[in-house]
């Protein structure tokens, strides 16, 4: 399971945190740091193969892949690799609490926007 987040949601989260950054750092010996770490994520983990299938559907919709694209023929499943984790999940409750922001672009919509951008930027595939 992976927590995928649309890039515009990431940018919005960063901008919100940056506009409210503390003015100055406290002395290193201080008990608390003036800066906080915030997770920015969609908080809705999905299976990697579900992500890939959804991306395939959106690429077909934008005519970047043929209608009869055979995902299985282009898929090679490997065992867990060094550094892989079984699941990732972003707890965004501090971000929502402190900045009133929670990434909200659903996976399908984010991949649809990506496919449209890709087609507009690179052009249709031949």
Predicted region positions:
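C-terminal substrate-binding subdomain of Rossmann-fold SDR/epimerase-dehydratase oxidoreductases
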Residues: 1-126
